[in-house]
């Protein structure tokens, strides 16, 4: 059972990674361009909030990268769902993933949506088996998408978003209340949150808090966030070089890619 869930999860992750890598590196280039071209000390608080889109070249890279990143959660949820319920589940997963992306449940919400979408289709199949043959034939093109997307949407709106979104909001509020406390303790917590779930709710909460600190002119908090986010992919890449016998040939070949992703601050590369 555990291996089956892992296989379904990795089907989503493997399809998601190209969007993460492409979008993440383009966004990193946008920040690099602004970092080289703009004097941060000359900007006011409102202008600092736009860091990464200040110069036209940076804004272009950021726009393209953001679009690619926007597909991350729908693709993750869609292909997890497809691994469970085959092609009819893909649409449900995409809808659930997009609702997680546009809402507050984020990465964890997309994971729940992917698995839920797959099992919704399995349930609908059992129900449709009892229908007259004429109705059963139109189920894949009519009943599965209409009823399935409706159930998926209601589940996201009334269960996943309130619960998981509430957890994410509580995390952000907790970090905000620590803003005036010891910066060393705050840095340790944020760095650990960035590294612990590699793109999940803890990671995203820490990143949002770090970007908010930049907008307020506090750069040292984001430094801790970035170091924590770079550790997992860089550590895995280093491990593939130092302990080659512990990894498969395919994993060893992906090691250098993880170095690049780590230096580009793409924590999800460790997945």
What are these regions (language model features)?
Residues 1-133, 137-271:
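Pore-lining transmembrane helices
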